[in-house]
Amino acid sequence: AMLCTAGATVIAELSDAPMSSTSRRDTMTALEVYTRRLHYGCVSAAPSSGESTTDKSYYGLCLVTDDGETLSVSENGSGMAVSELDIFNLNDARMRSQTYADAPRMPIARYTWELHLAETRLTRRIKREPFVPDGHIAEFAERCLTIQATGLIKRMEYTNCWRPVIGVSGGVDSTLVMLACAKAMDICGLPRKNIVAVTMPCFGTTDRTKNNAITIAEQLGAELRVIPIGESVKKHFETIGHDFNDHSVVFENAQARERTMVLLDIANKVDGLDVGTKDLSEQADGWCTYNGDQISNYDINAGMTKTMVRAVVKYISETTEDKVLAGALHDIWDTPVTPELLPIGDEGELLQKSEDSVGPYILQDFFLYHMVMRGGSPAKVLRLAELAFKGEFDHDTLVHWLRSYCR
């Protein structure tokens, strides 16, 4: 800690821990905990087998650990672990942390030497979905739902409004909100009929999404209301003098605002709360209608990125005992992300897909994490993306969507 508070971002450690049945795992765990708490990189090396004596054995365990993540470990006593430490990320994490705010600065000896900078090939693994853990997905999904449910419960307590009102579209975002609201009702010991699920088909609604929305509401035991808004929107177009065949932003936003008005009015009518469905990815990108889906009484998806939402919905689809619910959840997970604000095709097919406009959400969330959460420059993020998505997206595609994201 003294070295870190003095400014050290990388600590080279000579370890004297002998080999045991648990020493490898114990050393990895300890370094992950320490480096995460103090935000530093550690290069650790233990004695090789040549140092083994009568009562102690060594096998040259070497590790490279970066801010809580083990990047490289020597295997079978090879005594070699190679990886890269991200100094920029470490400094950025320290600026965001309270650990160093009031930490005392201790006097230390300082030595200087010359370093030659050179760009090398990156060897460390870069996660494609940085917001979603590699393992323990069950714990991750349950924690996400619990956090959403407990936040909603507290808001309902403050307002004394115990009826969540949700616009259900048949997409992953509103589906996750339905699941979280059902969990909130279960925790409170309230009937799930307190949930008012409202589906509002209009010009861009497909049978697939409408049927999935109805199935989710019915299987979760919510009160279902099907309210077509097409005629109301057409009347609004007449009022403002907008041509129905002009599929501009007016055409799209009028539908989104009509849905929001219906939800807020129903919430007033049942003494409830309009629970929003927009997620963090959409908010960060501005992919929502101002005074439409951009507003609600309480938004429990605000801290969930699109990849997180999809991961939780997929997990529930694979673990629920309700086969009908599981089928609908899987189909929702498999449905292209869409606001359904433009008319469908002649054969009822979906024509408007969000990812055609804003880019693949797996890239959106990757950019969000490395630029906003980690403070990376566009050039750095592009280099990381080329490594993470090698073979999936070419250079020109990554540049195109990164420019779009930074615009």
Residue ranges and their predicted role:
Residues 2-81:
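CN hydrolase (nitrilase-like) catalytic-core segments centered on the catalytic cysteine
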